[in-house]
Amino acid sequence: MGNQLAGIAPSQILSVESYFSDIHDFEYDKSLGSTRFFKVARAKHREGLVVVKVFAIQDPTLPLTSYKQELEELKIRLNSAQNCLPFQKASEKASEKAAMLFRQYVRDNLYDRISTRPFLNNIEKRWIAFQILTAVDQAHKSGVRHGDIKTENVMVTSWNWVLLTDFASFKPTYLPEDNPADFNYFFDTSRRRTCYIAPERFVDGGMFATELEYMRDPSTPLVDLNSNQRTRGELKRAMDIFSAGCVIAELFTEGVPLFDLSQLLAYRNGHFFPEQVLNKIEDHSIRELVTQMIHREPDKRLEAEDYLKQQRGNAFPEIFYTFLQPYMAQFAKETFLSADERILVIRKDLGNIIHNLCGHDLPEKAEGEPKENGLVILVSVITSCLQTLKYCDSKLAALELILHLAPRLSVEILLDRITPYLLHFSNDSVPRVRAEALRTLTKVLALVKEVPRNDINIYPEYILPGIAHLAQDDATIVRLAYAENIALLAETALRFLELVQLKNLNMENDPNNEEIDEVTHPNGNYDTELQALHEMVQQKVVTLLSDPENIVKQTLMENGITRLCVFFGRQKANDVLLSHMITFLNDKNDWHLRGAFFDSIVGVAAYVGWQSSSILKPLLQQGLSDAEEFVIVKALYALTCMCQLGLLQKPHVYEFASDIAPFLCHPNLWIRYGAVGFITVVARQISTADVYCKLMPYLDPYITQPIIQIERKLVLLSVLKEPVSRSIFDYALRSKDITSLFRHLHMRQKKRNGSLPDCPPPEDPAIAQLLKKLLSQGMTEEEEDKLLALKDFMMKSNKAKANIVDQSHLHDSSQKGVIDLAALGITGRQVDLVKTKQEPDDKRARKHVKQDSNVNEEWKSMFGSLDPPNMPQALPKGSDQEVIQTGKPPRSESSAGICVPLSTSSQVPEVTTVQNKKPVIPVLSSTILPSTYQIRITTCKTELQQLIQQKREQCNAERIAKQMMENAEWESKPPPPGWRPKGLLVAHLHEHKSAVNRIRVSDEHSLFATCSNDGTVKIWNSQKMEGKTTTTRSILTYSRIGGRVKTLTFCQGSHYLAIASDNGAVQLLGIEASKLPKSPKIHPLQSRILDQKEDGCVVDMHHFNSGAQSVLAYATVNGSLVGWDLRSSSNAWTLKHDLKSGLITSFAVDIHQCWLCIGTSSGTMACWDMRFQLPISSHCHPSRARIRRLSMHPLYQSWVIAAVQGNNEVSMWDMETGDRRFTLWASSAPPLSELQPSPHSVHGIYCSPADGNPILLTAGSDMKIRFWDLAYPERSYVVAGSTSSPSVSYYRKIIEGTEVVQEIQNKQKVGPSDDTPRRGPESLPVGHHDIITDVATFQTTQGFIVTASRDGIVKVWK
């Protein structure tokens, strides 16, 4: 544009927002600044944020067309330049008021980035300078000159990728040196007076006026660039090189510019040189580069490409050229729009990245080397993605990347770049991410060996407050992670404080230190900060030691309790840690916690000192008489270590030796070894005289001969007597009156020793019977002596076990209305109050005999029967037994591989069999059998007879088909009567790599199948889930369908499996299970690909036999309900759901196949009549919440069970009336309210009639498995869940005519009773850690529950 434009004063000044009234694709967001030349704004577009530059048109005759064409051509030329961001659009249609330029918005330019924390380090500055030269080189090779390179026009993304933007070819090339108006108008947009323009672009004012005078028209201030000025005013490459040199110099001088306007004009005339600013550039090669680029003579400046070659290996490391530039360029492409994708790509390439940037796998080089510092550039890519990650897998992958790269990064990068994002992840919504973020944060901070001055208070002011909430997190795995890492966190915080103190002392002792005045009373500051640090850590340690979950306490003790002692000091270790640890022995139900106490007590006692021995003595004695033998072993080991460290006083040692010596004949091998270990350590600690005078008397009863070297374990073990028999020991220990038993055994011993003349038989018949039982098990006199030696231990152990039982009964008694019949000695008896209904004679007869049929020859040949027609045959062996037992006709294998009943036509069901290739005998005695006399009857009568026969057969087939429907079973193997699973984990299967979507069990329960988002279907052998095998693996894996497998179902009565993927594929698989478990095989039989645009992918599917057809019914996301006849490979029926009611999420088919019900994302439940294929009725949930899963009610034919989004609601609806009849409500919200304080939902349902008392299993997003007793709702309970699950009760109430069963959390924990299923006395985290997606059951020798979760875990429970 012409220079005269700068002198035009606008007649009207409008706000930049006013210019958006005429453009419709862009919505004004905010102003980015305005100058006389351009008004700049940020606008919203459907593809993201854009920058809009508005040029107000004061003169309508301005020739803007040529400029627009030039910008369009520039955009095309720079299309492949990855470091250039040209204007994407130029517009001049805004009511002719203004011309507009549009480009993508980038938040930061280089000017802002230089002064923004975290500040750029040396390698990042080199990387940006390298990219600036690369961008200039890309533009020049494309035939484009920029014309206005400055820090404001160099955009820097959050991952330090440079974009050169705002190409200014429309700005004047030459400026008058004596008139700053043009410079201010076109180039000084920031008003900083900073000048980046090459000196040759300034010309003498008089010459400037003379050269351009003939081109100007006084009435037109803007000239057409097609004139001679375009040739004379052409931008040169050297001009851009000068501007780029100024930008690079400002980058390396922390924002100090090389020139302002006056200095540049002086530099042009040789009166000024920016030597003072250049000297601030510490790196010699960079300083030399800038000096060459800003040379006053344009001819002395090289091309950008030449500078890149010249500085290769000098200013710019070799790795920029060979790896970083091509690797980072892929993230600038549009194909990597997702942060999750970037993280996964980097994780995949991590090995190659480390090899290229570090040259080795372990960080053994010095930190200052450029190769390793190149990782900082990669770290910026990772950190730029962290806040926008969506998926749990991506977040965990990012944390894994950080952990791998952290040892190779500098302290400043770890504290300034990594730590804030780890604290951000500690507030993530996913518990696994929070837990892993805490672990990663701890490991990263442990790598910091020096503390920068500006980070001296990072622990008390930033890190510890940032993770404080995790100590009381709702998820147990997060608190576990905190307990696991708090010792290392405290240790690292103390090291930080000591490093700061050491630095302060060094500064205080340094007489040349200018900052000595800032350091006052370092010792006082240290003591104060140490006390504050102790208080912060102590608060969290006490919280964790008081956690309701024992596993959290156990984890804290097992992971660094000794380091916490060192952190707190001796006094607080005794007052805080030891005082809380002692209370753990009071938990009689969790031996793991008690065992962890003895594992940890040695380190604590070693730090506190021998003074603690008096406190610990009764605790150790209690451990020696624990009811759990593992705890005894751990107590023995703790005593051995404490004795070895000299922490026990000598009187205590002898007292323990007397208690431990009887363990030398204990039946447990580990306890014997532990006792031997303690005895040998004591023998080494005391004098020889004490060994023989005080120690040997304890050992004599348990060794076969005297020994000298008691301190040697092998010697002592070799002379030990045989231990007491395990069976005798256990039987005696379990006896109720163990005191009387030992009294009698003691009398027998006295009689053997001659102290008593005679030992009368016991008066108590129970003791006599007990003694008789012990003698029958092989108890000898020697065994009696060993039992008497263990008397004290057995008495205490028996009492401890009795206390556990008493406590459990105490807890049981607190349950309202619960009576323990076993404790009262009442024997249960069962009497049938209702007699089973007798079937009519004609129905019983139909179960024993079958109707023969005149199947035509074509059908017979199709199904393999070659017998001549009309020949009665005997019923094949096994056929009528099958009919009697199942009420179903014998089945045949069709050409499609599906077991289906045979039929006489496509409409009329017929009950026949091809077993042994013989038809069955007739069922009706009145049936006219073909005979020889028919030959003599006329043809007409013969045809009439055949017609009558056909009609009878048709009637009979319809009757049997109806009977088959009436006798349809809900499931082939229902749970046994009174089945109440205890929530014991049997198998933990982690073969799937992504979310498991469905579980299905075969009809005979020998197999079950799972499908997952990882694209695989896995087949499992149910028999192997009983815990009898050492390993449990899937027997088959199928992964050839592609995409994510969303649903599957077994075909009724067969080992054929139908699966569906989100890529539109539906496949039928055959499983050869006859050879299990040796060589099972799986092979596809049929498949079809759905039209993704018309139908979409399958969301749910079911299979059923309708007699004449074997139908696979599936529903798609676009509303199609299709019945695929697997015999004919065609559609038996197709229904179309109206999407106005919402997308189909689930559907269920009536057991008699008369109707089906679909559930939608808008809460609608719609019924279809399967006979006429017409919609019947539609009902909607009051809150229009999404229907997650549908199932038919096992008892009421018109009821459906619907799991609804939110509040864990499961409701049962009468589809005939549209009423909600029964609701299960596991939420704290008021029942049937439309509020959702609980976002949890049920994702999986299993329902069974269970012998007339229906049961329901539900599982979902709260990771709990609930057992609902629909007949007696108060008996419902949580089978398994997270370890932090409080105890709950269930109450029934009527609300607005709907029966509601509500789950209410109890205020106090109630211990499990004997007859209430429970998870056992152990509090291990066996539950799912992610959303449970499905639940099913199978029966082998007992009933099992199988569940699957979103993290790919499959668990089996009983």
Curated annotation (Swiss-Prot):
Modified residues (Phosphoserine): S808, S813, S853, S865
Tissue: Ubiquitously expressed.
Record annotation: effect of changing R936Q: In a breast cancer sample; somatic mutation
Residues recorded as bearing Phosphothreonine in the entry: T1316
WD repeats: 991-1030, 1040-1079, 1093-1134, 1139-1178, 1182-1223, 1237-1278, 1327-1358
Disordered: annotated segments: 875-898, 1307-1326
Protein name from the UniProt record: Phosphoinositide 3-kinase regulatory subunit 4
Organism from which the protein derives: Homo sapiens
